[in-house]
Amino acid sequence: MSTAAAQTVGPSADYKISAEYTSTSPDGATKVEQYAKISPDGDYTWQFWARHGDQLTLLKPEQPDYAAGFRFTSDSQWLVRMQKTAAGEGTLYLYHFGPQGFVAATPKPLGELAWAYFNGRPDSRKIKKPDFHIDAGLLKGTDDNYRWMGEKWPDSRYLVITLSGDVLPNGRHSQLRSLRGWRCRYDLQHGRFDVPPDFAESNAKATAPRPE
């Protein structure tokens, strides 16, 4: 079976759509539909499908337990999946529209890449390394290119990602929120991260020490 044909098959019959989670691209051409399969024990497995005309594309990977949030860039060509993975934890996946529909745009989850970028920067040495409630989020603003932040960036060029994490309690301290919304920017055109100078004040607060 060809790739194109396989993409039109869609979810198997044991997956049922949860219509309340359906989201639509700004140009109206793509809908993201979320389907859940419930096991006899009541466990959920979620699949996410992008519907563009008569083409259905599975947005891998599937996810146990949790539905997801989705945001498109204003040009409708990029799609970010905001995925809860556990209580207080989450990551991001990035997809790009092409001949096969929306497909993964990065070899690893975008959230994982953002953490790797943070861990290579001096800010990471200012804090206790998070080992609990590890979360990567997408700051709102993809619809207006972050103009609400005062930015004047090109249309659909950048994403702003926030990172937060806790440190588990031990004999010396209680649970700590060691990183609180540290920001970086992802360049969709070139596939790389940076930290613009105007993020400095926010990131200083995100890494400021808290009493143990």
Predicted features by range, described:
Residues 1-18, 91, 99-212:
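Acidic, small-residue rich beta-repeat scaffolds with periodic aromatic anchors
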Residues 12-46:
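Beta-strand-rich domains and repeat architectures in extracellular enzymes and scaffolds
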Residues 14, 59-64:
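Surface loop/turn motifs at the tips and blade-to-blade linkers of beta-strand repeat domains
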Residues 35, 82-83, 162-163:
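Recurrent small/Gly-Pro-centered beta-turn motifs in extracellular repeat architectures
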Residues 37-41, 85-89, 166-170:
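Short glycine/acidic-enriched loop and turn motifs that connect beta-strands
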Residues 66-68, 147:
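Beta-rich catalytic cores
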Residues 74-75:
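Residue-level detector of Asp-centered blade-edge/turn motifs that repeat once per structural unit
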